[in-house]
Each structure stands twice: as C-alpha cells, then as structure tokens.
Amino acid sequence: MNTFEKIYEQVKKIPYGKVATYGQIAAMAGNPRWSQIVGYALHVNPDPKNIKCYRVVNRFGELSDNFAFGGKSAQEQLLESEGITVEDGKVDLKIYGAFL
C-alpha cells in the first residue's frame, strides 16, 4: 500500500458528523510529519464520494481555503449537512473531533 492509499484508508475511518486534523490522519497513516502530504493527497482525491476529505481540517479546526471540490464554502456545506456546526470557518474540535 502506498502513502496516499494509507492516507485514504485513514480518512475513511472518520465517522459521519465528525472531523479529524491533517496531523491526526498523518499519524494514523504512519508518520506524524506527513501533514502536508495528507493535504496534497486529499487535494488529488480520486474518489471524493467514498473518501470524505471534507472531514479533514487543520489543527485549529479551520476549514481549507483551497478545498479541491468547490472551495471553503462547499466544505462548510458538506460539514453542515452532517450536523457539524461551522462558525467563522472553524469547527469546534472538542465537540466534533473524531480522534481526541
């Protein structure tokens, strides 16, 4: 399994209505220093219907300005459709964090 496949497998583990950070996904995929690689892998996500990359946020709970599948507003809409509250472009990780 290559690095991107490892990342995609971890993203698939984020439950409905929850989020994870790039760093958490990196650590779960095998290397906590892969945060930027996680971001790149999600940007080229080959299967966004099954690999829910919109559930990944930064360490502060902030949405991505460069969300590859419609921008920040699309990411916000997708998260809100799962019942996740987004305020000022941020998600409360204490409430919605999957792996805290």
Question: Language-model segments: what does each one mean?
Answer:
Residues 1-100:
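Nucleic acid-binding interface residues in structured DNA/RNA-binding domains
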